Each structure stands twice: as C-alpha cells, then as structure tokens.
C-alpha cells in the first residue's frame, strides 16, 4: 500500500510512489535467491512504467536488463499463506506484472539491482555474501575485520560514518588509555604505525593524559591503510544498520545508505555476524538479552556494587579538537545559548574556583589545556573530566532522531566549555580545528560513549574475577583473549542527580584478561559481540571499555568468527585453546604478564602455562599502572615453565569450557 507524491514546478510535473512505512525513495523490494526463485535476483518495482529501466549488475558491471514477468511477490505470498491466521481471510497475494528477474552467477562478490525512473532518479538495492560481517568500523570492528581476513575468511566491515576507528578517531578520543607496556597484536601495530608517522614513541607523549596521543585524522588514515592491505576484507561506509534475520546457516542483514530515504539499500548474507557498534544495537535487534545501567550486588556478587540496580550509565562526552590559531587570533565563538560559567569554575584553578571539587586536584588552566596536547603542538583534545565537557544522557534505547537531539545537547556543553576557556581563562587563540573533521561544525562524527548495552553472555566478567583471578570457582583467566591494565574508572559527575547516586568505592585491581565467553551471547547462534557490549558487569566495564582492550576484543572476535566459518561450527563450540593459539601466533597477550614481550622465545610458553594455572603470577597495583608478573622474584621459573610447555604441553592436553573448567574428552 502507498500513495503518489506530485511535485509541481509551473507546468512541469514530476511524481513518484511512496510506500507506507518506507522511505520516500524506496521504490522496490528485491529478493535474492528466494525459495520461490532459487538462483535469481527478483525485484518487485512497485510503480513501474515502460519508461523506467531495471538493470542487474555484478561486481559493478552491468549484466543485463532484467526480464519482466507476472507472478506473486514472495513476501506477500509468505504473509498471506495461511488465511486462517488473518483478520480478513479473503485477503491473499495476487499476481503482479511488475516483477523482474535475472539469473545470479555463483562467483560474483557483489550484486545490485538498479532502477531508473522516467525522471532520471536512480534507486538501487545491493547484495553481498560473506563469511564474516562486522557491523561497526570502530576500534573493535576494524580489528575484528582485519583479523578475520588474515585468518582467511571472506570478511566485510560496514560502518555508518566515513571514518574507521570509532572512539579513537571518529569520536576524537585520540589519547590511548592504558596497555602502554602491553602493546601487541593489531593494537600494537596501530601504535607502531603512529610512532612511525610522528617520528618515534617519544613524539607521541605530547600531552600528559597518555603516553600515546595523535591527531584523529592520522589514526583514521592508518586504519584505512591497514584495512586496504587485507585482500579478504571488504569495506563499505555510509550504511546504517536496519535489521537482521536468522537463517539456517547464518544471518541476513539489512542496511540503508545514510540519507537515501530508502533509495539505496544493501542486503548482506553472512555465516557469522559481529556486533561492533558503539551501543550494541545489532545484538538487541537479534534478540540478545542485555543489561543497561548499574547492576545490583545480589545480581553480580560484587560487594562494591549498589544494593539496588538502576538504569544509570556513565556520562558521554562530545569531544572537540582545538587548534591554536596564533597569539593574535581571536577565535571566540558566539556566546552559546544557556551558557552558565558557574558549572565550569572548578575545572581548573582560577579566581572563582573553590575547594568543593569532590576531593580532586585543581590543575592550572595551562595544565588543563596541555592534558590533551596532540603531536605537533598546535592541537588539543578537549575531553576534560573535571567539571568539563562530560554530559549525561542515557541514549541506549532512544530512536536515531532522539539520539541526534541528545548529541546536539552534548555538543552544546562542549561549546559552552570552549566559550569559558576563551573568555574566562583567556585562551582566545584556541578554536575548533578547521582541518581535522570534515563535518559542517568541525566536531567529531560521533560522541564518546563510555557505556553501552551489556549482553547476557555465556559468562559474565566481574570485578571480582579481575581482582582475584585465581581464587574464583570460575577460573575465567584460563580463557583469556585480551588484556588490560586500566583501573576501574567511571564518569558520573554530570548526572543531574549525581550527589544521590549509589556511593561506589572502587578498589584497585591488578592487570587482567578478558574471558572469551563474554563475547558470546546466550541462546543466539552465529553472533559475536565486541566493542563495549560484551558480557561484563557495570563496574568492570569501567576497565574493559578502554581502547586497547576493545581493540583486542575485536581481534579475538575476528579469530573466533573465522574459525567458526572454517570449521563449520557454532561460535560457542569453537575450542577456547584454538582461538588462543591463533592469538598467540599473532603476538597477542592472553595473560597480562609483563615479564616477556611478544617476540621473546619464551613469551608464548609463559602465556600458555599461565593460562593453565599450573604456575600463577602475582598482581600488583601501582598508582594508575596495574601490573601482573609471571615470576617477579625468580626468573628461573620462566625457564622451568618453558620446559614444561615444550615437553608436556599441558595447555593443549586438557580441554576447557568457556568457564575455564576442565572438560573430559
């Protein structure tokens, strides 16, 4: 059902059909290898007339004009198959003369139906099939796609915005938090390429928030270069996720070109689907159960969790990259609507600052600016956590339109903070960088989300698992696929009711590893969840959400997906040790031991022995630098572990499940 839209320009009249519940430019429904039309592409072009062209393409080359025929729409036939289930039993699928068909070759990488109406408007729907589909090209997604491709799986990343890297680049958080002494895998490669670009690792220590800072556009360029080097990896930008259906052997996933109003659609059939979106939107659409907000103590067993659960998430930040335009420049922006200097007075030391700053240190204005100083000395990341530009909004269950509205509010806070910096602190020479983000307002493409949906996975990683990995009845450390050393860090001060939030006292934790089962949702097959939506408690998310961990999670997701495709197994049935073997061969830590770095002849040995628990390391907390050592006091233990690994191979002899428990063959 639908209606006609007529556009009048004097005596010139143009029109088009608009279906109910579809975008204005949606002019057809395409069926790829449908049950009723096997081996064919079939399009129902709703408002076809003889002046229209209906063409079929494969791999970007026109194959033929599609042949018109009379038949029944497959979707309508399915909907009206059982009259007894309908409110009006006399309704049925009828014949239409607006069907078009073309045979599909078996070896095409991509297919497209392209329709051109009498006025020259072009509408298209494309189809691809792949082994591994990664939705989201953020920090986790780009690593997942690259690794799956390296493992030999035909892989595809689909990212809505024009950049790769997510929070590291598209959100402007170009300061890496943690893992400086555990750089490995694709994360380590990215860091090495940054160092090469800027002239060494010392050049990356430009600000004091991190040992590795960089300009976001440089990070995006590096990620695109890394992706382009993988022959098994495809990449599509500008497509928004629309939905997914489970099939017998995987998923059929639907996308729409951003801003096309239904005129440019894409369907992808995949064996394994990876959700690497910023908020876990794909997992939710696929029916995965999930949690949002703070967990209760009774749910997680964490004694530092609040007594009652709630839906409060961490503050987000709409970062800005500032640029120094020179000492004589006046980049002062127009006073933002609703500007209130009082909310920023304790962001740094100043004539109006007070001692009521939640017990935090007040830095000088220049120190605050230098916090996010980027290499080159002319740009600064504005992502200040102390009465700065954090913003509270729980957008997880919002519609795209509602999210966009919330993001503009978050930008407003950053604009207000910038105005405060320019007018109250005297940095008139600083303004939004005009050569960083190709966006109308110069802001990043997306905000920085610190928290997302958290799935109910095969296992749930808690802060207790991290704090005392060897004391748990559930030895998840044996199943590690990523490591982190960042403290439990939560942002809540911009919540309007922050003073009444549950009081959380985060105790120090050693460095930790992330269990493989936290990536695998319960009861939903052929799906892996990465980024910040893994199965982790709200508290532990404060450590697992950081960029190095998220990139390693993505790399592990890529290995897991590729092995599932190669073996023809369900994701949950892929052995933990098989995934760990590939990661170790790729120079990735599975245990957070600092004794040896990847490339050392005994690195893999202590990683494997550590993951069996035969020799257990020692965790330490040193300020913000959390550590774990395999043999802190006796280096000879490393040689003994290497000998055990070589002669007895306990890592492979004992099979374990996703909980780290031994399983009898």
Regions found by a protein language model. Give the residues of each.
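Catalytic cores of secreted or luminal carbohydrate-active enzymes
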Residues: 2-29, 575-592, 598-616
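Binuclear metal-dependent phosphoesterase catalytic core
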Residues: 2-61, 92-125
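Aromatic sugar-binding surface patches on proteins
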Residues: 73-103
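Beta1/beta-strand and adjacent pyrophosphate-binding region of the FAD-binding site
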Residues: 128-138
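Conserved N-terminal/central alpha/beta ligand/cofactor-binding core
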Residues: 147, 153-154, 159-243, 247, ...
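Conserved beta-strand-loop-beta-strand element in the redox core of flavoprotein oxidoreductases
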Residues: 245-267
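Flavin (FAD/FMN)-binding glycine-rich loop and adjacent Rossmann-like elements that form
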Residues: 259-272, 276-583
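Extracytoplasmic Gram-positive cell-surface binding/anchoring modules and repeats
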Residues: 592-606, 610-665
């Amino acid at each position: 059902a639908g209606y006609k839209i007529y556009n009048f320009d004097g005596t010139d009249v143009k029109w088009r059909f608009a279906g109910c519940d579809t975008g204005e430019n949606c002019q057809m429904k395409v069926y790829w290898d449908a049950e009723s039309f096997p081996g064919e592409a079939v399009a129902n072009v709703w408002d076809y007339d003889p002046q229209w062209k209906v063409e079929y393409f494969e791999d970007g080359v026109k194959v033929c004009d599609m042949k018109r025929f009379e038949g029944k729409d497959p979707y309508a036939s399915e909907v009206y198959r059982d009259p007894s289930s309908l409110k009006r039993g006399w309704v049925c699928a009828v014949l239409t003369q607006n069907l078009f068909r073309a045979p599909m070759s078996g070896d095409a990488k991509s297919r497209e139906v392209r329709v051109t109406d009498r006025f020259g408007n072009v509408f298209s729907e494309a189809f691809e099939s792949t082994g591994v589909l990664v939705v989201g090209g953020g920090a986790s997604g780009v690593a997942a796609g690259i690794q799956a491709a390296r493992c030999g799986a035909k892989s595809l990343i689909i990212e809505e915005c024009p950049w790769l890297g997510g929070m590291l680049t598209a959100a402007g958080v170009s300061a890496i938090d943690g893992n400086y002494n555990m750089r490995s895998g694709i994360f380590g490669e990215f860091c090495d390429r940054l160092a090469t670009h800027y002239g060494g690792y010392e050049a990356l220590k430009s600000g004091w928030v991190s040992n590795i800072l960089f300009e976001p556009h440089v990070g995006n360029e590096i990620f695109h270069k890394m992706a382009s080097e993988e022959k098994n990896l495809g990449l599509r930008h500008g497509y928004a996720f629309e939905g997914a259906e489970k099939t017998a052997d995987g998923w059929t996933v639907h996308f729409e070109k951003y801003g096309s109003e239904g005129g440019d659609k894409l369907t992808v059939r995949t064996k394994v689907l990876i959700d690497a979106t910023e908020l876990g939107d794909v997992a939710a659409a696929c029916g995965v159960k999930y949690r949002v907000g703070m967990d209760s103590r009774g749910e997680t067993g964490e004694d530092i969790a609040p007594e009652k659960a709630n839906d409060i998430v961490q503050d987000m930040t709409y970062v800005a990259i500032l640029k120094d335009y020179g000492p004589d420049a006046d980049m002062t922006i127009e006073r933002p609507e609703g500007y209130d200097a009082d909310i920023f007075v304790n962001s740094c030391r100043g004539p109006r600052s007070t001692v009521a700053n939640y017990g935090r240190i007040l830095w000088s204005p220049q120190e605050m600016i230098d916090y996010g100083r980027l290499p080159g000395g002319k740009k600064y990341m504005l992502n200040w956590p102390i009465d700065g530009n954090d913003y509270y909004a729980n957008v997880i269950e919002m519609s795209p339109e509602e999210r966009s509205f919330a993001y503009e509010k978050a930008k407003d806070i950053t604009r207000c903070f910038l105005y405060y910096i320019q007018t109250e602190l005297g940095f008139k020479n600083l303004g939004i960088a005009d050569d960083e983000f190709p966006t109308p307002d110069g802001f990043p493409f997306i905000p920085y989300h610190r928290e997302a949906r958290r799935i109910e996975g095969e296992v749930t990683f808690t802060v207790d698992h991290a704090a005392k990995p060897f004391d748990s009845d559930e030895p998840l450390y044996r199943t590690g696929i990523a490591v982190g050393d960042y403290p439990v860090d939560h942002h809540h001060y911009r919540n309007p009711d922050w003073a009444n939030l549950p009081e959380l006292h985060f105790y120090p934790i050693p460095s930790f590893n992330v269990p493989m089962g936290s990536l695998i949702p319960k009861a939903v097959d052929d799906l892996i969840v990465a980024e910040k939506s893994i199965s982790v408690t709200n508290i532990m998310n404060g450590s697992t959400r950081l960029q190095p961990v998220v990139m390693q999670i993505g790399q592990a997701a890529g290995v897991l997906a590729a092995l599932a495709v190669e073996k023809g197994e369900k994701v949950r049935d892929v052995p933990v040790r098989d995934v760990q073997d590939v990661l170790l061969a790729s120079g990735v830590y599975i245990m957070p031991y600092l004794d040896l770095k990847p490339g050392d002849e005994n690195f893999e040995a202590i990683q494997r022995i550590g993951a069996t628990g035969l020799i257990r390391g020692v965790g330490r907390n040193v300020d913000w630098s959390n550590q774990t050592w395999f043999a802190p006091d006796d280096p000879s233990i490393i040689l003994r572990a290497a000998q055990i690994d070589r002669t007895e191979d306990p890592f492979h002899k004992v099979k374990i499940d996703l909980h780290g428990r031994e399983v009898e063959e």
